[in-house]
């Protein structure tokens, strides 16, 4: 279990919180593994009805940890933990609610295409700088995003790298409700508790129907992952990452 993932229970709600604020909740392989385990363990617990995924104040997640990315790009690691997390999210029988305040970058954005209800603050920002790093979309976003928000808006988000504010994300269908920052966690919990009061089998079936074919979605994730992996090891991506790290270093 990663020290940066906090798992707790409130009634029938399984709460999974990212807590690596000093790195803006950038996700390491250990964090992915811990989240996958937390979701899978609670998903087979009859006392749990809903999963709730949270970040911190002003930060949901900055996306993948760049150190892990660089290790994979240099050919030393494979990073299967992220796919285990995707699989756990997609195959969860119980609904997943997310609460977002502040930045949601890369997979910090695409995760919400695989959740059921996302509550966010107006100051939240959803962005996917994949192409700027020589990469391509992931987590089934290449198909789910155009269905959810239309090709133009999805292409602007996933290819152009255009950020969506909290309200713009709500209008696009990525977010269900906008609340004030001080109300985010209480509203997210209240929503999860409302869901938890529903008949559990009916609730699980409803999620299954609305998610569609889980195998097909995971197959899509794996196709995206193969392309993502090829890109990650490409000269183009290595140069883009190096330029990014140089810019970051120059800013101190």
Where are these regions (language model features)?
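Crotonase-fold acyl-CoA enzyme core
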Residues: 88-203, 234, 239
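Hydrophobic alpha-helical membrane-association signature
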Residues: 31-34, 81, 111, 184, ...
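Phosphate-coordinating loops and pocket residues in cytosolic domains that bind phosphorylated ligands
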Residues: 26-29, 62, 71, 132, ...
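C-terminal alpha-helix plus adjacent terminal tail
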Residues: 1-11, 60, 161-167, 182, ...
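Glycine- (often His-adjacent) and acidic-residue-rich active-site loop
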Residues: 40, 55-91, 104, 216
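Histidine-centered beta-alpha loop that forms part of the nucleotide-sugar donor binding/catalytic region
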Residues: 19, 64, 101
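Conserved CoA-thioester-binding segment of acyl-CoA-metabolizing enzymes
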Residues: 1-56
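Hydrophobic/aromatic residues within transmembrane alpha-helices
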Residues: 16, 53, 65, 111-113, ...
């Amino acid at each position: 279990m990663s020290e940066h993932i906090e798992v707790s229970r409130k009634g029938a709600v399984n709460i999974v919180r990212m807590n690596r604020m000093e790195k803006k909740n950038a996700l390491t392989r250990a964090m992915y593994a811990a989240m996958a385990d937390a979701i899978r363990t609670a998903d087979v617990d009859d006392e749990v009805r809903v999963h709730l995924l949270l970040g911190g104040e002003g930060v949901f997640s900055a996306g993948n940890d760049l150190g892990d990315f660089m290790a994979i790009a240099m050919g030393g690691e494979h990073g299967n933990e992220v796919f285990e997390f995707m699989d756990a999210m997609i195959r969860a029988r119980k609904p997943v609610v997310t609460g977002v305040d502040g930045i949601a970058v890369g997979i910090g954005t695409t995760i919400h295409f695989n959740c059921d209800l996302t509550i966010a603050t107006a100051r939240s920002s959803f962005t996917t700088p994949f192409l700027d790093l020589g990469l391509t979309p992931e987590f089934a976003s290449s198909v789910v995003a155009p269905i959810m928000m239309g090709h133009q808006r999805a292409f602007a988000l996933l290819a152009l790298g255009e950020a969506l504010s909290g309200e713009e994300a709500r209008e696009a269908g990525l977010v269900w409700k906008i609340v004030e920052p001080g109300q985010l966690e209480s509203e997210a919990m209240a929503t999860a508790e409302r869901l938890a009061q529903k008949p559990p089998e009916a609730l699980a079936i409803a999620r299954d129907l609305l998610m569609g074919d889980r195998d097909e979605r995971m197959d899509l994730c794996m196709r995206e992952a193969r392309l993502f992996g090829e890109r990650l090891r490409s000269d183009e991506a290595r140069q883009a990452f190096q330029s990014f790290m140089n810019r970051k270093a120059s800013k101190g």
